[in-house]
C-alpha cells in the first residue's frame, strides 16, 4: 500500500520533531549536568553525529522510495537535508565559539587550514550551505539541469563527513566506523548511477 499525501505530511511533522527534540535534550544536558567532564567535546560530537545521522537519512530516502515503491517519500528529502545543515551549522558554531572562543575567531581560518580533518569539515559545510540555498523550487527552475548536477555533490559530503569524524577522534571507537560503513553502503546502492557518470 502506497503512502498518501496526508501520511507524508504527518511523517514530515515527525521528522521535524526528530530534528528539534535532540536540541531540547542538549539544552537539558547542558543545564542539568548531563554531559561529561569535557562538555565542549560532548557538544561538538553530539551536534556532529546528529548532522551525520540526518545526512545518512537524506541519502536513504531515494533508494528506500525506489525499492519500497513509495515515490512520495521523496518529499521528505529536502526536510532531512535542511535539518542536516542546521545540525552541521550548530557543530561548526560549537567549535568556533566554545573551542576557540569568541575572542579568538580570527584563528578560525588558520585552524581550518592547518588541521586536515577541519578542512574536510568546512568543505562539507560549504557544500551543505550551497545545497540549502538552492533547495527551493525557485532555485531548481532557475538552475535547470545544473540543479541536479549541483545537488549530486552531496555524495562528496557523504565521503568527507565520515572521514572528518574518523579523523577527529583521538581513540578509534566503533561509532565513527559504523557511520562510515553506513555512508559507504548508501553510496554503494547508487553504483549504477556512478557507473553512468564514468562512461
From Swiss-Prot:
One of its GO terms (cellular component) is plasma membrane. Pfam families: Ferric_reduct. Its cofactor is FMN; heme b. Keywords: Cell inner membrane, Cell membrane, Electron transport, Flavoprotein, FMN, Heme, Iron, Membrane, Metal-binding, Transmembrane, Transmembrane helix, Transport. It comes from Salmonella newport (strain SL254). The keyword Flavoprotein applies. This is Protein-methionine-sulfoxide reductase heme-binding subunit MsrQ. It is found in: Cell inner membrane. Belongs to the MsrQ family. The keyword Transcription does not apply. The chain crosses the membrane at residues 10-30, 82-102, 116-136, 153-173. The gene is msrQ.
